[in-house]
Amino acid sequence: MLGCGVQVKSKANKSIGAFDMNALRWSKIILCTDADVDGFHIRTMLLTMLYRLTPDLIENNKVFIAESPLYEITSKDRTYFAYNEREKDQFLGELAGQKYTIQRSKGLGENDPDMMNLTTMNPKTRRLIQVKPGDIQQAAQMFDVLLGDNLTGRKDYIAQHGSEYLDDLDVS
């Protein structure tokens, strides 16, 4: 799919091409998922797959995340796109006393094509987050804890650190 092969060393991979950055079909790999918790889970799985199969793409700054709006807020003369709760609250504060409508995005597949063209798909206006290699060992360890085979380790991590992520929960 990407054209560059994979970096997995295994006898079972004989039919899969060896990794070659020069064969990459695109200058950027852009992950686009829903802006809710389910979308974040899918994004994490895609990043894990890329990290495990093609870590050089991350190390060479080829992987990006496209943010999609979570809310569309329309007032009399303007439309605002909020990408998180903080931005939504900020826009609503600016519109205090005015009439507006607010629509929560149900997912990329249900967004209006015009809205997607104005936001997520438009190279001039979209928000891209570059996935940076950072501390690759720390990232590898976190991927293994959250998505690896060690169920006890994952439960222990969640029990010890779960409270640190309470503000990020989507309970709507």
Model region roles, listed by residue range:
Residues 1-172:
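Conserved phosphate-chemistry cores used by DNA topoisomerases
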